[in-house]
């Protein structure tokens, strides 16, 4: 690590790519200590036998299957030797407990799962005698299966479904999962038609090849769109702008026309009830028309103010396309991030399951053994939950810092032939050596906002239908405010990472510097975040629409099943996810380029010794703006371009 003994300069000057020093080392140490705590939770759950109980399974008497057990004092049938009984078998696998998320059935350790359906207790007896696998409670011998009066309650529910062991988890699971499907039907209120879910699942299974092909199509379309945006960004932005203006004007005009038409045709001779309804409708149309007019006027004023700044959005999108040409590995960044998140989530769920089987044995209300954590250690669940949010945000922040570092390297390298062989890997190297503490701090700030919001959402869901209107309104307002704060902090964090990548300053310094730059360029930020984000959103909709249309055409000719709604929904959701991943990277690149451009125009003016770093396309934008400054009536843009002189700021 390059972090040892590094110091932070008190005086801060923007010095792209010249110096790198370690940032926020205390936060890195805190994050490492937190991860050690996460490891302790995992080690504790394994040391207390939770891992073996989860993987190998245990019966209702606390015995772990597949091994010799020690006696648990005070519990009957504990301490049995199950070396030859490697599988957990549930007497009634369909008896599900939704609240506690488990099967409410007696569990036994057996040597073999029933490979065929067993219709009667005589079949169960014959299976035990033939295969040596006793499917009834340990207190019964196979000879008692058909004679003992306790057999109906201590033997599996008939008919015993055909089962197969779950790989790696040693549980006997019914091959036909109809009981789970029916339970899901009740859960999602499909009780009115018990065959709906079966037909939906059948549609997914029959169309799996088509689903995979359409998912691949969405991937290809996303990559094609990223190339297209570079070359037609100018046309696309103006088309979107014109459509928005025409749509708002047209909608406002239609509302006023409807109001005038309804007012003209209002019949005062109608019955009182109908007359009141007509007057209410007329009043509503008037309110809608006035609101639409105000919205349209504000929108047109914003378009008028920002019309020349739209050119900057177009130029940035053009340069972003060039960035992807020079840094092709950027395209694969979402995959690496998703892979890292997936690995962590799998680990987190596994430890969560370990914790679910950790602790000391106790007797539940049915008289069987369960394991619970008592004392202060029971709060490990909360620690584990905070770890889920913080580490997930840390991984996402690492992606943002990696992209920012690579794009900053591209922007501030005058000769693109001097770029590192792999700027992405160079950025990852800088991240690991210098800036992990900054990333950890930024992720923690998001976590601090996200956890209270999640708690309030949980309280709101638990009190649904019980709280009064005032409390409900306050809860929703708090949740909304925290959500807005989270989004604002996430945007500021992203720009802080860019400032750190440029200047190697700590998180707070970088966030303050980035905020100053953003405030000085507020109108430009508004133009990029409205026009640019809206264009990318339409790109996502375009990919989903094309994929969905292709899916409809393909599925319409598939006659092997009757319902293809669920396959189409799956395809469209995957298409939106893929498009979001790709175009979000595009959006990040544009945001990083904008901050670099704002810094470039603030501290350089093109004179000797203060040459611009920017791309030719952005240079043309600056030159066009300078020419506009010299024209009569260009005072607004003149104020915007004054910061190009050294020491001034951008409007």
Curated annotation (Swiss-Prot):
MF-aspect GO terms: antiporter activity; choline transmembrane transporter activity; ethanolamine transmembrane transporter activity; transmembrane transporter activity
Q: Which stretches of this protein does UniProt put in the Extracellular compartment?
A: 47-208, 256-284, 333-334, 398-438, 555-562
Q: Where is this region: Disordered?
A: 629-651
Q: Which residues cross the membrane?
A: 26-46, 209-229, 235-255, 285-305, 312-332, 335-355, 377-397, 439-459, 534-554, 563-583
- Positions annotated with a glycan in the UniProt record: 131, 176
Q: Which GO terms describe its biological process?
A: choline transport; ethanolamine transport; transmembrane transport
Where it sits in the cell: the answer is: Cell membrane; Mitochondrion outer membrane
GO cellular component terms listed in the entry, alphabetical order: membrane; mitochondrial outer membrane; plasma membrane
Superkingdom assignment: Eukaryota
Which of UniProt's keywords are assigned here? Answer: Antiport, Cell membrane, Glycoprotein, Lipoprotein, Membrane, Mitochondrion, Mitochondrion outer membrane, Myristate, Phosphoprotein, Transmembrane, Transmembrane helix, Transport
Q: How does it sit in the membrane?
A: Multi-pass membrane protein
Membrane topology, Cytoplasmic segments: 1-25, 230-234, 306-311, 356-376, 460-533, 584-651
Its UniProt entry gives the catalysed reaction(s) as: choline(out) + n H(+)(in) = choline(in) + n H(+)(out); ethanolamine(out) + n H(+)(in) = ethanolamine(in) + n H(+)(out)
Which InterPro entries does this UniProt record tie to the protein? Choline_transptr-like
Q: What the protein does?
A: Choline/H+ antiporter. Also acts as a high-affinity ethanolamine/H+ antiporter, regulating the supply of extracellular ethanolamine (Etn) for the CDP-Etn pathway, redistribute intracellular Etn and balance the CDP-Cho and CDP-Etn arms of the Kennedy pathway. Involved in membrane synthesis and myelin production.
Regarding protein family, the annotation reads:
Belongs to the CTL (choline transporter-like) family.
| The protein's name in its UniProt record | Choline transporter-like protein 1
Which organism is the protein's source? Answer: Xenopus laevis (African clawed frog)
Give the gene symbol.
slc44a1
